[in-house]
Amino acid sequence: MNPRQLEQMARQMQKEMMRIQEELANATVEGTAGSYITVTMNGHREIKSIKIAPEVVDPDDIETLQDLIVAAITDASKKAQELAEQRLGPLAGGMKLPGF
């Protein structure tokens, strides 16, 4: 493969990477903790919304609410990571991508 072909391949990969990054920014995943907490985030792991069921809000038990929120965020983050790995996997040739 000559240098010109390598350069062209690199440009194509960069263009595809940018397209996938935009796709991830627009994609959403939901993480849940039971039916009480739902966290929505995009493929870049940016939280877009948190929904809390009123029945889980107990002023005398804030710790449970906090634990549920953490669990829902962790679930959503894991799903966002899986989505990114799925979309970016073909470009990485099966390598684990740092930060995803």
UniProtKB/Swiss-Prot annotation:
One of its GO terms (molecular function) is DNA binding. GO terms for cellular component: bacterial nucleoid; cytosol. Keywords: Cytoplasm, DNA-binding. It is found in: Cytoplasm, Nucleoid. It comes from the Bacteria. Pfam families: YbaB_DNA_bd (PF02575). Its main location: cytoplasm. SUPFAM superfamilies: YbaB-like. Homodimer. Belongs to the YbaB/EbfC family. Binds to DNA and alters its conformation. May be involved in regulation of gene expression, nucleoid organization and DNA protection. This is Nucleoid-associated protein Rcas_2292. It comes from Roseiflexus castenholzii (strain DSM 13941 / HLO8).
